[in-house]
């Protein structure tokens, strides 16, 4: 099952992110979870990190929460909120509407 995990960073969280970035990356690389998509959310200027998003393929919601709980960012208090939502990939990993037109 696919789950979307959306974590919102605390406004003063950049120091926490910086301090635990290497451990976060190592956790993601070592995780047995099938991570389909992952990355930070950013402000409109694309400069400041505002949170993180993951789409993971796991057996159930409990596994998605356990994956997120094990992330050093979560464990060290970077996030002020988190949502875990079941996700349906209607594109099956392919662009749904063809290539973007300029």
Predicted regions and their residues:
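Conserved, structured core segments of small domains
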Residues: 1-102
């Amino acid at each position: 099952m696919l789950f979307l995990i959306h974590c919102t960073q605390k406004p003063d969280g950049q120091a926490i992110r910086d301090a635990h970035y290497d451990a976060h990356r190592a956790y993601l690389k070592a995780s047995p979870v099938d991570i389909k998509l992952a990355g930070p959310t950013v402000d409109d200027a694309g400069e400041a990190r505002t949170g993180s998003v993951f789409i993971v393929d796991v057996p159930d919601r409990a596994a998605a929460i356990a994956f997120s709980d094990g992330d050093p960012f979560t464990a060290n208090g970077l996030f002020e909120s988190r949502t875990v939502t079941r996700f349906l990939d209607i594109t099956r990993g392919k662009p749904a509407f063809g290539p973007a037109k300029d």
